[in-house]
């Protein structure tokens, strides 16, 4: 039920926000104009874990274009996110964000990594049941991303009562069927994280994902 609520709430957010930008939004982010805002300026109590600024992601390296551990959105999307956040806080939850605006340089980095089939540094953590050259075919990686418009974000819910993230069926950037919005079966433990050890945060940079 919680997963369904989040999906509906964020679908409403994106339906509202996508009317505001298109390609111009990405260009505005690049030139530093006011079309984009820092999410924490609008939703100050949001939790940020910008995975692509660090090395614990499916590539295993900081992603090109991620110069700071910040998250940007178009103003309209951020205002809509604030409304969602306020509703969730009343129910005892906070938003935790992994990614928002994604520069095209970052998308290009994913594509290059996807073509380097020998680089499987993070396979056991993010795609243990997938062959790497299937990631394009299954649409886990693409040459263009809705994130680059600045009105898309990746997030989860943080339960303020338990001080834990809500189980969404799979970890962030899990390349598997458990990540699909219509997944209804009981997820395998490996997809949810608790039985899968995390690698050290100081991983060596991969040679160099997601839509």
List where the protein language model places each region.
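Positively charged n-region of N-terminal signal peptides that target proteins for export
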Residues: 1-4
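C-terminal motif of bacterial Sec signal peptides marking the signal peptidase cleavage site
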Residues: 14-17
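Extracytoplasmic cell-surface/polysaccharide-interacting catalytic and binding patches
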Residues: 19-100, 107-209
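Sec-dependent N-terminal signal peptides
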Residues: 6-11
